[in-house]
């Protein structure tokens, strides 16, 4: 019999393909269904809309499901629950039941999830025996709405239309798939066959094509996709029956291909494949349309005879068909499958568990193992013998209670899902759908009269649930109730028949269509003769005697009837449903990851503190890196009783110098390496000498510290080369102390403690400053003079018990200890101890000088000068006192001239030149024109300002009337705010624009992700979190782009010379850099925290949810990403964590405390910005949430940044030789080096300098203002030693000066722009320099006089310059005095006016100031206006400048000007005072305005 069947098939193939071949240019039917209908190419294609055969029924008419309808689960329990095992009265076999699933999967897949996921909840009745066994009433069955066309669902005229992801044609997509890549993965490309794994079976899914692979509910875990067979439909491995049909059709294709190849060996692989595919499709079309459909609907219902192809007929799957009618076969599916052995004997197999049938609920998504265990033959034979369930409303529990679901809800209800699918698709109610198909409406009683009679209570309950209104009855419920023993009811029959008719008539490639030229009439008749039985026999080892003629039905007399009607009795029980969260096992990783991220900045801060403390602990700092105790000196060894040792003296944290320590008898001397005493300490009889030294082996690099304390003076802190030197040093101290009975106390301490306790000269000075501030606050009764951080009252023992020495008093007054004025004042004041002065003693005398009447002050001065106590003062003693004051003030006149000036002053007061003594009356006459209350100086606050007589002559340039000076009220908040806005209007505008752009970018992205991005599931999963983080990302990208522009120093320098400089305050580029950095830190923090929350939500999502969230990513079907995956296994996660770490490192080491103490670390960590930008670019590349946009933000700034660096390299000058260097007072360093020929700059600009001789970390350079004029041949810099690098440079220069060795070479970059370079843009300019801030004006003033004294004067716009120099004492700036002398000598008459404000007298004695005024006034009057202090014509002022009065004077002097430039360089408080003065002056709208440019150090 087998041979007869093979012969028959061979004849069939010979008949069909014997007379012609398939040409290469012949049209092959597409896999995706497109262009089947040439007029409507998308009809029936994969991804096309479902066909709407009746109007949609949504509660809002657009897309909303009617939530007022009864619970789908409750309907399922009432109507579809029942006993299984009732045989089908028509004799339908299980083959028909499972083949209906093949047909459904062949033509539709409309339950795919849509993005965003729309999950509805099906309410479970209380105490449901499957889903609510504990009677909690909280369980809800999840239902996910189907994928739909995004172009629909937007209005009443365009209701939501779901999508069919399969083709509507019967075209073999169940076997081949719907895409070319999918088909290619299935083919062997040999002889037209589909690829095989083992013979007769397709390969397993090692290539991981996207087959459906949900977690089998019976094991409740994800399984590897490698175990699944690869076939055309992704759902084919769902159950054993479905997979068996898939394998049958797979073999049918290869069987056909073999036959065709045998007949036509010359055909190509593609020709054979397409020919075999044609026959497979044709045979499926015939079996489905003419065998299956009548079998399902009943023999009396058949499709009409085929007439012709009808291109106007839409083949699309209708909503009513897919969501209701074609779900009727659920009622005939049995709970288990019989397994029948091959052979002539009628034997059935028990499954491996000993159960008589294979339970369906226990084998979801395990079909491949069943097939391999029992074979396709046994499954097919079992289904052929097994009678299906009866055609009724009952659905077995394997489908109704235990069908597979997602992992978080492992079992679902297929009936409830079908009801919800109809509602989701907008299928109209039962009666309305009947009217659409020309059927009369039904009532509750007539819907199924037999059912109503038998189950009246159920119908009544149903009626109650729908409120008695049958107009709301779901079509699926009504259609299922219509059915009976003869199959589906009339509504479902009409829908199914209509659907298959449209599919057939609208298919251009239908096998009966004569116009497509595929088959002849004879070939069509031959195809009509093919049955499913023929295909089974051709593809299995089943003999024809084992199968009935019609495998869809089992009739009496057919071979091997079933032994029993399968029901749930005696079968393997179903594993109950389980609920779980996808967050399981993620808690620990998530919590510890967040803790780790939070600890990153703390760790960075800890590392920074460790670096700083370690340097302190081992006494290591950059100032002593290159210094050792091994240096040459004039007296290296001990001479006689003199002990000597080389050491390093630790003066302050960033300054260490080489010294020679010598101990002779009871004196310890600190000397310079080549001679010269720096300090002497004498040990007194009975003195307690305290010594602290480092613990043994404190540092292998430098050796131990020694601290020697001294009362009323700063400690001596030295570092010896070794512990051996330390031992010898201590022995010498003990020996010196033993001779005078002094007690020596020696203790060892850790370096960090020792250095922190050391009262260095700097720390002692801070304490003295506090001492004097508090005393002045008491004396002047002015709380503003107090330390803002120290609270002082009369009970503060720490201050009251403080004493100062004569040397410290002299230093505070700016005098020397041997100064006559100091000696006399100290002798008169120190009453309890001749060596020290207490706080109360100092306060008493201070009050006398400040608050006492003028008469009492003169008496005090008279007592100081009356050394003999005879109530008269020796003329020469008073002369010596005045001479000491002049010497302190730095008077630049000889002693003879001073004596002449002194005699002139006395003569002016009426004292005879012959008088040897002066009486008190002479003193009174001498100071008669001095006010009783004279201000200390010109304070910044401008309160109660009245120029004194002495000041008036010195302040004649400022003699203006100020209406508000005498009656100025305290500044209100509004006044301060308005002054700030007036001063910083450009800055405020720029910052406002910056903030506005940040907010616009943030809210644009926020709005987009919160309200617009509906095609993703972001909003449902993450809520506002994703909107916040994406908004922060947009603003952060902008900040990171902008921050690059703020450091393009070379480009900024070029822009300063353009009109842009008038609108953008480039002076504040670094300040703006910090503002942008703070905003970036805020956005980055918000972004990071937001995503930490977001990824928690991501970790709770199913695979479908993740597919919607991350549409650009692909996850394996057996892979559910954990939180550790997101954090540590994705580019986004890893780069995100790396970015947090890098950003924390950069920001932490950019804190001022680390910049000051660990500058190298700051420089190095800022190089991580390169990695920061690279990581940020990588961060967005995976496109998890959106396409990366960071590159669009930064591409322009990066290009400009690179151009800026190229310009910088072009302006990089290496190994410049220092030709001259000096160490000036106040720790100022002067260097002069050769100017490169091509180096051009403007006065007021600055350069960055580094030196290869100073061992610094990579790329360290420091900025300094240029002191030389553009016309000079050499470059000059004046550098204040304040940090590690400058102190190290100072030490190197000292070494070179002492040893005569070459100066260190330097590298230079620049020049860079500065606000001071704009002075030439104004006709009137005001320049204010304070401290080392006068450096840029050394260049500017020289440039000014050289320009104005040359023939090109007419090219210089500037016509008047006011220069104000604010300094504590000009003695420390002799170099600048020389510059001013040179400027005065060359300046054109009237172009430059200079004022010098000496602030050291502020908080000092007004008596001293008064005497200086008197001498200065008389000297100027007799020496052509030259100052006796400076030798300059510049006016001297004792106190601080009153900028408000000065600016008002300038406005009155230059009314014709519209704008006047103000340039300042100095400390913050100076610039703030100038800015405030400018703001006040700018309120005068009819006067010139002031434009302030400043530099702060």
From Swiss-Prot:
GO cellular component: NADPH oxidase complex; oxidoreductase complex; plasma membrane
Free-text function comment from the UniProt entry: Plays a role in cuticle biogenesis. In complex with doxa-1 and tsp-15, produces reactive oxygen species (ROS), which are probably used by mlt-7 for tyrosine cross-linking, thus stabilizing cuticular extracellular matrix. May regulate the production of ROS by playing a role in modulating proline catabolism. Required in combination with mlt-7 for correct formation of cross-links in cuticle collagens. Association with the GTPase rho-1 promotes ROS production and this interaction may be modulated by memo-1, in order to control the oxidative stress response and longevity.
InterPro entries xrefs: DUOX_peroxidase (IPR034821), EF-hand-dom_pair (IPR011992), EF_hand_dom (IPR002048), FAD-bd_8 (IPR013112), FAD-bd_FR_type (IPR017927), Fe3_Rdtase_TM_dom (IPR013130), Fe_red_NAD-bd_6 (IPR013121), FNR_nucleotide-bd (IPR039261)
UniProt-listed Enzyme Commission number(s): 1.11.1.-, 1.6.3.1
Cytoplasmic side stretches: 609-986, 1046-1068, 1156-1163, 1211-1497
GO biological process, one term: superoxide anion generation
Start and end residues of each stretch annotated as Peroxidase-like: 26-590
GO molecular function terms listed in the Swiss-Prot or TrEMBL record: calcium ion binding; heme binding; NAD(P)H oxidase H2O2-forming activity; NADH oxidase H202-forming activity; NADPH oxidase H202-forming activity; peroxidase activity; superoxide-generating NAD(P)H oxidase activity
Notes on how activity is controlled: Peroxidase activity is inhibited by aminobenzohydrazide.
Mutagenesis or variant effect for residue 246 to D: In e767; growth arrest, severe blistering of the cuticle, incomplete molting and mild shorter and stouter body shape. Resistant to iodide toxicity. Reduced catalase activity
FAD-binding FR-type domain ranges (all copies): 1211-1318
Organism, as annotated: Caenorhabditis elegans
Assembly behavior: Interacts with doxa-1 and tsp-15. Interacts with rho-1.
Lineage: Eukaryota, Metazoa, Ecdysozoa, Nematoda, Chromadorea
Keywords: Calcium, FAD, Flavoprotein, Glycoprotein, Hydrogen peroxide, Membrane, NADP, Oxidoreductase, Peroxidase, Repeat, Signal, Transmembrane, Transmembrane helix
Domain Ferric oxidoreductase: residue ranges: 1030-1210
Catalytic activity annotation: NADH + O2 + H(+) = H2O2 + NAD(+); NADPH + O2 + H(+) = H2O2 + NADP(+)
Protein name, per record: Dual oxidase 1
